[in-house]
């Protein structure tokens, strides 16, 4: 009897399990085929675990087990069909029957069953369909299906199975285990996409009831790397908690379009919050996320983020818009009589933020940073970060930089939006630079090892119109030209160095002031030389400490600076200010920031630094520095500006030091690493003029494991408090704050997270949150309660934004969150490991 099956080899042999190891499934296949409508009991789940190849392993603390791999040895030809069976009956004009340990293999696809029927095209005699019954097991790379019935179409490699228990190994973004579930029908298409009817889907272990999707249908698109569930219910521990007609989820690590999990939450300033994010994967190099939010106290906000990445550019655009904010409208109505400056403000709230970096050529780069909000209270109402809530200056800047071997050229435009919340001392606006043109040259190959630096900069300063303080609208403005050439001759030896340097600073101003009666103009030209001599020595010795060999260095340094005095109080202050004194300021050539004030100097800085370096690796174990400046004359240049040419700086101004005392504060710094997990850094500055601390900070970091962190910080700065209000007095105007933050495992799966910041000088907390986090094999959860300092009320009592964060991550599916607190956690817990960001 002729078989006549094209590209098909039929063999009658005793079953040996040639293409698949039967050890993967310990229970008979029949026990795995259970009708879809039958509820999953613990016994059934145990059977399913065995059927799917689950191997319990208590040494795996998270998942408590693993799946045995699906191994298929492919045939030499992907089109070859090989069938094995105990017995077979073949016919030309009717279906052929195979019985007993049937195994069919085509390429990398293997199907096992007790019975199979082979159908052929009567004209071509080619196999068109093979039907499998009883104890069906369908295998492909990373795919396993156990079913009552299966049909395979060898021509296009499609197929379908009925009453299925399946396991799909897909490369999901953060799931630790493959997906598994049941379906009444699974269709496998020629392009290797799948359609599941009346199906369940989960990435939990078979005996874990944590979560599952139950859907009318699930479509899996392998090329796009996504799954779509329709008419789906999310079950948590078998209880239905959410219904959605459409749910999209990833099946690999690629980005894909679709709705994300809903956002739910509550805050005292916005009320209940419901959001439906939609992610649009527009192209491989740019995407967009749209997030409509419904706030019960405010209204409907539409937010979005657009990201792009090209061969030359990378950037992000963020925007939010909330029309007719109900809560803000009530705020305006309640306060416009007492504070008329807020009268007429729109209740439409919005924010835009744009960041871009474009590399046109290897030596030509454009950077843009732009942020603007609708009103002075937007950040207070919508930000969850203390740094943003208390921010009062929003940068808007674009610069174009061209770099050569010896020169850098830059053109820049810069301005700020200044926020003026009521009940605060008004923050002075910042001058606009429209434009700034800069050229900087550097040559280090001159004769006698000399180095030459030159900086030329042109700034056109504009004073922004400020409706909050009309008196400031006649502020000086106009162009400034700054030139600063520097010639130095470093003389270096292994044991030390000496570097003499000479330079001069030239500033030219063309100043105008606008008055009601007209405009006044004035010109100033200032040329000031600077002379300095910098020298230091290097000593080192071997050090043996607790079984480890170190090299200890001792580095004394002297720095003499001479700058003659020139009265500069007639010149406006565009960008200069006092600086916080620390070790770094010991060796600066100007005690003021910016270019508008050139500090006079006749002084000698002296400092001593010691380092401990590991002998083998060279890693720094410790670094201690201490230093001071000896003044040989009083400092006469003042920061203040006066049309008379005479003024005196306010001694309580932020960063101001005594101009008559013979020495500077003593500055010290320490960095010490006890071990790779534990380190401490700190600065302490003692001012002998006031016999008190000028500023200090101390930071501790302990991280013995990736998910175990403790941070502590303390800051003190005279006149540095950032929460100034109208009734402040000098005594409590120091920045005096402490912060403690931690993320610590409580067990294999549970951890605690929290942070607390306290304003010691004003006696109230600035920020606090506390929560717990659970991270298991197939899901993670964290709940945090916290508050962020917002402002002070009319009685100067602190007001807070109170938030509750609830975030649930279903690994392999997505997250449900009140709002993602990852930014807060990463800000206040440096080094924090976030399981919700696992990739």
Curated annotation (Swiss-Prot):
It comes from the Bacteria. It holds the Pfam family LptD_N. Residues 1-21 form the signal peptide. Keywords: Cell outer membrane, Membrane, Signal. InterPro entries: LipoPS_assembly_LptD (IPR020889), LptD (IPR050218), LptD_C (IPR007543), OstA-like_N (IPR005653). It is found in: Cell outer membrane. GO terms for biological process: Gram-negative-bacterium-type cell outer membrane assembly; lipopolysaccharide transport. Transmembrane segments: none annotated. One of its GO terms (cellular component) is cell outer membrane. Its main location: membrane. Component of the lipopolysaccharide transport and assembly complex. Interacts with LptE and LptA. Belongs to the LptD family. Together with LptE, is involved in the assembly of lipopolysaccharide (LPS) at the surface of the outer membrane. This is LPS-assembly protein LptD. It comes from Legionella pneumophila subsp. pneumophila (strain Philadelphia 1 / ATCC 33152 / DSM 7513). The gene is lptD.
């Amino acid at each position: 009897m002729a078989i006549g099956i094209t590209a098909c080899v039929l063999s009658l042999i005793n079953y040996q399990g040639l293409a698949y190891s039967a050890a993967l499934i310990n229970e008979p296949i029949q026990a795995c085929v259970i009708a879809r409508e039958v509820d999953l009991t613990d016994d059934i789940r145990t059977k399913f675990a065995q059927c799917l190849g689950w191997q319990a392993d208590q040494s795996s603390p998270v998942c408590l087990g693993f799946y045995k791999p699906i191994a298929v040895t492919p045939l030499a030809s992907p089109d070859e069909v090989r069938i094995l069976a105990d017995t077979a009956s073949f016919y030309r004009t009717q279906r052929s029957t195979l019985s007993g340990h049937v195994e069919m293999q085509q390429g990398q696809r293997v199907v096992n069953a007790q019975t199979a029927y082979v159908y052929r095209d009567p004209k071509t005699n080619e196999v068109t369909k093979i039907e499998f019954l009883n104890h069906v097991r369908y295998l492909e790379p990373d795919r396993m299906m156990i079913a009552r019935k299966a049909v395979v179409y060898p021509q296009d490699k499609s197929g379908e199975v009925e009453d299925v228990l399946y396991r799909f190994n897909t490369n999901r973004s953060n799931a630790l285990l493959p997906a598994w579930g049941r379906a009444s029908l699974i269709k496998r298409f020629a392009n290797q996409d799948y359609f599941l009817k009346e199906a369940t889907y989960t990435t939990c272990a078979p005996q874990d009831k944590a979560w599952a999707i139950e859907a009318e249908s699930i479509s899996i698109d392998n090329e796009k790397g996504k799954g779509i569930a329709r008419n789906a219910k999310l079950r948590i521990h078998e209880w239905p908690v959410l219904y959605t007609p459409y749910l999209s989820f990833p099946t690999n690590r690629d980005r894909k379009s679709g709705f994300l999990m809903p956002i739910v939450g509550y805050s005292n300033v916005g009320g209940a919050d419901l959001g439906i994010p939609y992610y649009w994967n527009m192209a491989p190099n740019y995407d967009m996320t749209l997030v409509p939010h419904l706030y019960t106290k405010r209204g409907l906000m539409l937010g979005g983020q657009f990201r792009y990445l090209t061969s030359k550019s990378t950037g992000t655009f963020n925007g939010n818009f909330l029309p007719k904010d109900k809560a803000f409208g009530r705020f305006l109505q309640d306060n416009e009589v007492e504070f008329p400056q807020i009268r007429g403000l729109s209740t439409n709230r919005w924010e835009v933020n744009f960041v871009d970096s474009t590399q046109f050529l290897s030596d030509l780069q454009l950077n843009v940073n732009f942020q603007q909000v609708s009103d002075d209270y937007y950040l207070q109402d919508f930000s969850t970060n203390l740094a943003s809530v208390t921010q009062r200056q929003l940068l808007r800047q674009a610069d174009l930089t061209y770099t050569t071997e010896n020169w850098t050229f830059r053109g820049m435009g810069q301005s700020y939006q200044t926020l003026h919340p009521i009940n605060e001392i008004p923050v002075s606006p910042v001058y606009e630079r429209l434009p700034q043109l800069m050229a900087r040259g550097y040559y280090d190959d001159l004769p006698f090892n000399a180095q030459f630096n030159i900086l030329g900069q042109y700034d056109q300063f504009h004073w922004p119109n400020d409706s909050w303080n009309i008196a400031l609208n006649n502020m000086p403005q106009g162009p400034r030209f700054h030139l600063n050439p520097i010639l130095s001759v470093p003389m270096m030896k292994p044991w030390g160095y000496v570097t003499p340097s000479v330079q001069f600073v030239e500033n030219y101003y063309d100043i105008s002031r606008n008055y009601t009666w007209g405009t006044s103009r004035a010109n100033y030209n200032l040329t000031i030389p600077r002379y300095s001599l910098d020298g230091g020595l290097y000593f080192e010795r071997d050090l043996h400490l607790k079984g480890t060999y170190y090299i200890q260095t001792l580095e004394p340094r002297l720095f003499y600076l001479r700058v003659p005095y020139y009265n500069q109080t007639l010149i406006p202050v565009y960008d200069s200010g006092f600086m916080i004194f620390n070790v770094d300021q010991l060796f600066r050539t100007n005690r003021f920031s910016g270019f508008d004030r050139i500090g006079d100097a006749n002084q000698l800085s002296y400092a001593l630094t010691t380092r401990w370096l590991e002998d083998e690796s060279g890693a720094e174990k410790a670094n201690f520095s201490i230093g001071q400046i000896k003044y040989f004359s009083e400092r006469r240049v003042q920061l203040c500006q006066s049309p008379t040419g005479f003024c005196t700086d306010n001694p309580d101004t932020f960063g101001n030091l005594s101009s008559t005392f013979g020495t500077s504060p003593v500055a010290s710094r320490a960095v010490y690493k006890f071990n790779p997990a534990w380190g401490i850094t700190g600065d302490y500055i003692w001012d002998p003029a006031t016999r008190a601390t000028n500023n200090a900070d101390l930071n501790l970091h302990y991280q013995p494991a990736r998910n175990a962190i403790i941070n502590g910080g303390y800051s003190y700065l005279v006149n540095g408090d950032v929460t100034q209000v109208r009734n402040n007095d000098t005594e409590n105007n120091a920045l005096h704050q402490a912060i403690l933050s931690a993320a610590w495992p409580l067990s294999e799966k549970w951890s605690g997270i929290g942070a607390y910041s306290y304003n010691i000088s004003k006696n109230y907390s600035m920020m606090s949150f506390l929560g717990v986090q659970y991270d298991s094999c197939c899901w993670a959860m964290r709940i945090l309660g916290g508050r962020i300092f917002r402002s002070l009320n009319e009685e100067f009592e602190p007001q807070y934004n109170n938030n509750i964060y609830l975030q649930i991550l279903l690994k392999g599916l997505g997250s449900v969150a009140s709002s993602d607190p990852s930014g807060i956690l990463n800000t206040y817990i440096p080094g924090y490991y976030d399981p919700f960001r696992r990739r």
